[in-house]
Curated annotation (Swiss-Prot):
Keywords: 4Fe-4S, Iron, Iron-sulfur, Membrane, Metal-binding, NAD, NADP, Plastoquinone, Quinone, Repeat, Thylakoid, Translocase. It comes from Synechococcus sp. (strain CC9902). This is NAD(P)H-quinone oxidoreductase subunit I. Belongs to the complex I 23 kDa subunit family. The keyword NAD applies.
Length: 210
């Protein structure tokens, strides 16, 4: 008698727990059903990268002086600089320059320390290939002009959540030309003015609001 009642109690407890777990799962599902869609239909829709996005490295062959600073500051000594010494001019002659993006960690050290600014970071991130050797870009591939999400006619640009205008939560309903929430880095710099104090180096202070 008591064993039967214990089984009924255990069954009832398990049924209540199952119903509670099911209700919690449906609560999460219904909560998401009320939200607006945020899924990006890639590759027809792409998010606009941030201003400081570190994508594929762009290289300008004419500016390079083969100083190999990029090789020394690279954590993995990745860039390959092939040069020969011109005995007539006693200067280096650059023959080839390559970077393997299959190994690159996109830290940006080479771009930051380049004395001639021949390297720059772009917003390209589509570097997938069937052969890993295809990721080894020479100076010709590195010199290709970068593409932009906002200028590609076959792509609908979408802003990330942090770059949406104030009050907007859905990137699908916001056009690319609407002002974002907050100021761009260039706009922030415009609000700074150099001021020299006696005995101190010049520093930037915020302009007084008009």
């Amino acid at each position: 008698m008591f064993g039967f009642l214990k089984q009924v109690g255990d069954y009832t407890r398990d049924a209540v727990d199952a119903a509670r777990n099911l209700a919690q799962g449906f609560a999460v599902t219904f909560d998401h059903m009320q939200r607006r869609p945020v899924t990006v239909q890639y590759p027809y829709e792409k998010l606009i990268p941030s201003e400081r996005y570190r994508g594929r490295i762009h290289y300008e062959f004419d500016k390079c002086i083969a100083c190999e600073v990029c090789v020394r500051v690279c954590p993995i000594n990745l860039p390959v600089v092939d040069w020969v010494m011109n005995k007539a001019t006693k200067k280096k002659e650059l023959r080839n320059y390559s970077i393997d993006f299959g190994v690159c960690i996109f830290c940006g050290n080479c771009v930051e320390y380049c004395p001639t600014n021949c390297l720059s970071m772009t917003e390209e991130y589509e570097l997938a290939a069937f052969d890993r050797h295809s990721l080894n870009y020479d100076n010709v591939a590195l010199g290709r002009l970068p593409t932009s999400v906002t200028t590609d006619p076959s792509v609908q640009p979408l802003r990330e959540l942090v770059y949406l205008p104030a009050g907007e939560m859905d990137p699908h309903t916001v056009s690319a030309d609407r002002p974002r929430a907050g100021k761009l880095p260039a706009e922030v710099l415009e609000t700074l003015a150099p001021v020299k104090d006696e005995g101190q180096s010049s520093k930037a202070v915020l302009k007084e609001d008009a």
